[in-house]
């Protein structure tokens, strides 16, 4: 979650986004960022413990000097973080053009960041191996979305998060954008790991030809 949130705020500063009063427009407040981290790093992380990846125990150990994140992982994290930040800023600029005020635009962006990150748990599982379906992850995502909806509708949580109520149309934008982010992340995942597979295959062929 850190990369999309950081990228969103950074891009907002870079493009000098401002509201109708001329004040700097922050896409997310500190409380909202903490909340997103809480619901997206909690239940989904626990559910991923139950992931089943066929053949993973037959893989040789990684070299001791290998980095924690390989090139494919770095490419995927950077690409998806930038993509999600771009969509978030797009919502922040789109909603006022549709006639909604800045508070609704910021709330729409907040809900998209939360719901979108929950859905991005699925492409984040995909590496050069494809895990088997995980019903615990499905449950974690459903519960996470439910908690996000409750946070939007309960007056206490809405006040604590500085979150304005949004109409049904805006919820359609939230879920539509989240599904779009999911689909784009799936494509980026396949491209990242396919490129890594080509490099590994070329390296193996070179090694085989070396006397």
Over which residues does each language-model region extend?
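Membrane-embedded transport module
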Residues: 1-128, 153
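C-terminal transmembrane module of polytopic membrane proteins
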Residues: 107, 111-211
């Amino acid at each position: 979650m850190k990369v999309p949130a950081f990228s969103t705020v950074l891009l907002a500063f870079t493009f000098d986004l401002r509201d109708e009063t001329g004040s700097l427009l922050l896409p997310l407040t500190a409380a909202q960022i903490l909340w997103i981290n809480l619901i997206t790093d909690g239940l989904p992380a626990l559910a991923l413990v139950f992931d089943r990846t066929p053949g993973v125990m037959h893989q040789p150990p990684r070299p001791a000097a290998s980095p924690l994140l390989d090139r494919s992982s770095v490419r995927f994290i950077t690409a998806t973080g930038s993509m999600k930040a771009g969509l978030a800023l797009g919502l922040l600029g789109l909603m006022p053009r549709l006639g909604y005020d800045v508070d609704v635009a910021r709330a729409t962006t907040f809900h998209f960041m939360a719901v979108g990150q929950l859905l991005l748990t699925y492409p984040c599982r995909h590496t050069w191996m494809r895990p088997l379906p995980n019903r615990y992850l499905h449950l974690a995502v459903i519960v996470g979305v439910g908690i996000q909806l409750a946070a939007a509708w309960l007056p206490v949580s809405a006040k604590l998060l500085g979150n304005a109520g949004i109409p049904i149309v805006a919820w359609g934008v939230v879920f539509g954008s989240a599904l779009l982010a999911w689909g784009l992340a799936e494509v980026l995942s396949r491209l990242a790991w396919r490129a890594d597979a080509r490099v590994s295959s070329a390296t193996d062929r070179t090694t085989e030809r070396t006397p």
